[in-house]
Amino acid sequence: MRVLFHPDFPKEVRKFESDYALVSQGLAARFRSEIDEAIKSITLSPNSAGHFLNLGSAVVRELRRRNLRAFPFFILYGVTGDRLIIGAVIASRSD
C-alpha cells in the first residue's frame, strides 16, 4: 500500500510539537513519539487502527480517525484503492 501525506501534515505536527516545547522539551518529544507510533499503527493496519469519522448526524466511512492516547488530538486518514492518505492532525478539544 502506498502511503501519502497531505502537504500540510508535517507543518501541523511541527506547530503542535513546538507549542508543547514551550511547556517542556520532554512533553514535545512524547507528543512526537505518539504521532510516530500512531502513523506506524495506521500504516500496519489502516482498516483497524482507527474508527470511522462520526459527524454526529452522519458517519463518513471513507475517512477514519486514530485518536492519540495521551494527547487531545487525532489523525484523520483515508484508504482508497491501494493508497493510504494521512490527512491531518486535529485537536479533539479547544481548551
Where are these regions (language model features)?
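Basic, Lys/Arg-enriched alpha-helical interface segments
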Residues: 1-65, 80-83
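Enriched for short, Lys/Arg-rich terminal
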Residues: 68-95
